[in-house]
């Protein structure tokens, strides 16, 4: 068995969570690897303690500089911005792209990698249409190590609980979702809304201001904003406490929180666009059709005229969204468990994902 080199970020946010799941699968296979952490980020604090896994990773890190040859392909998981740089003459890059107008810089980066893999078919088709013949599709898997049913009772009444998950940003249409939900269901004891939109790239006071702004200066007894969750165990508990997850993002590379929730048997209301389409259907989710597109620029994470992250995202009609919520309520009233959603965890696995990764190396 040959030694496989990896260039990954190991941290608590989405890129790091995916990287860690890949590494864990490789260890279970007893695959010999060497690892160079991107930006020297090596933070397993969100993961359950596992000294053996951490020791295995540290050995892989310690061996990278002495064992690696640029003649060997390296698997890298990172943004397009920063992926022209590589440790290999033939880099295999896995990246996420959520918009619709690749810049000349982004196109050039893709073309200069040996292989670029995206977890969204729409993204693959976009880059192929722009002359990138080296792109491929690979879906993510369900992280069964961190996410599982707790079988706890979280509430003493029969409320139906909605959740919105994912760091706050304009691209995810969070503001429009929350305000539409409040207009329809705010201060209704039959329903509650849990928002886990803490953005670790913003200051705590900025996150608090966002929450206050979404409430429009009013008080709603059936809405809760959660703070940062430093442990995946807490995050798993949060997902388990919900009945319906809401995902109306205008552009997604996969939609991890919504996907994990559906795999746990939670009902979902999703925008039928971008990567949601690659795993959601009308059996495992309530699908809302996009109403069109809008510019992504928000003056915070997306700035017009820059060499990266340019274009538009999908939008939705508020009435269509509320209709989707009402349909999801009916599904919950029929059964709290989304059995079709649970099937996703067997269809999309990290075992299958790593099979594909290894085949490219």
Predicted regions: what is each one?
Residues 1-71:
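N-terminal pre-catalytic "stem/leader" segment of glycosyltransferase-like enzymes
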Residues 4, 154-172, 178-181, 193-195:
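Conserved donor-binding/catalytic core segment of Leloir-type glycosyltransferases
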Residues 42-127, 233-234:
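Extended catalytic core of nucleotide-activated donor transferases of GT-like folds
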Residues 104-105, 142-159:
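Acidic anion/phosphate-binding donor-loop and adjacent secondary structure
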Residues 205-233:
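Nucleotide-activated donor-binding/catalytic signature segment of Leloir-type glycosyltransferases, i.e.
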Residues 250:
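Aromatic "clamp/platform" in nucleotide-sugar-dependent glycosyltransferases that forms part
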Residues 267-270, 286-288:
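Short hydrophobic beta-strand element within catalytic cores of glycosyltransferases
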Residues 312-323, 330-359:
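A charged, aromatic-enriched C-terminal amphipathic alpha-helix characteristic of glycosyltransferases
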